[in-house]
Amino acid sequence: MYKRQVLTGTPIRQELLNGNREAGRQFCGFTADKPVLMIIGGSLGAASVNDHVRKILPELLKDFQVIHLCGKGKMDEKLTGTAGYVQYEYIKDELPDLFALADVVISRAGANAICEISALHKPNLLIPLSANASRGDQILNARSFEKQGYSMVLEEEEITDQKLLDTIHKLYQERHSLSLIHI
């Protein structure tokens, strides 16, 4: 290494590291009696993930409160006001507080998303974009994190409503065993 060089990783927005769990709870109107599942569809949303989540929402709400970042134009107005469920197209200022509130996270496997989730030590389920819809980089990212014990992975082509529900419950039950917690 040369004296004037610095080796870095992916830049992380520092404000994400300073979230306040109670501020997040207040923003969402959630109670402290159930764990919080945060679903991030990316800036464009993840239509198939959104659809599956909405189909299993009644089952999810038995055990979780759900924050659903569904992407621009992807909100389902019929679900507005559902107890224990909030949906947003996009969140900026409150995002650190929502991350602090989340017990487990479901996300795509883009490089920035997984680096932020890693920095926050959040147990996570990654649903990478399919090889048909991408360069395949998200699949490689997700499998790398899974192999190291940092994440659980569910391929988009393999998702069924029941499989997603079962995997979410497994993620929560095994959240302390994911080695990401210990990074």
Predicted segments, located by residue:
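Short acidic/histidine- and often glycine-rich active-site loop of Leloir-type glycosyltransferases
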Residues: L7, E116-A119, R135-Q148
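Donor-nucleotide binding loops and adjacent catalytic segments primarily
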Residues: R21-A23, F30-V105, I139-R143, K147, ...
